[in-house]
Amino acid sequence: MSVRRRRERRATPVTAAGLLSFYEEYEGKIKISPTIVVGAAILVSAVVAAAHIFLPAVP
């Protein structure tokens, strides 16, 4: 088998200066699962719909 030489990746000035990074992981302080976010959105929508149905509009 022949040995393949890999190209050396050269850092561009933008990425070398730290101005642009693609694979950076950011960990926020608040961690909420997507299930809770969707559930909260459905709950808020239901409360707003119930308020429109059961509470009279003030002229």
Curated annotation (Swiss-Prot):
Keyword Chaperone attributed: no
Protein name from the UniProt record: Preprotein translocase subunit SecG
Segments crossing the lipid bilayer: 34-53
GO CC, alphabetical: plasma membrane
Membrane topology term: Single-pass membrane protein
InterPro entries (UniProt xref): Preprot_translocase_SecG, SecG/Sec61-beta/Sbh
Encoding gene (name): secG
Pfam short name (any one): Sec61_beta
Function (record text): Involved in protein export. The function of the beta subunit is unknown, but it may be involved in stabilization of the trimeric complex.
Topological domains, Extracellular: 54-59
Keyword Transmembrane helix tagged: yes
A GO BP entry: protein transport
Subcellular location: Cell membrane
Family: Belongs to the SEC61-beta family.
Topological region Cytoplasmic: 1-33
Keywords: Cell membrane, Membrane, Protein transport, Translocation, Transmembrane, Transmembrane helix, Transport
Record note on quaternary structure: Component of the protein translocase complex. Heterotrimer consisting of alpha (SecY), beta (SecG) and gamma (SecE) subunits. Can form oligomers of the heterotrimer.
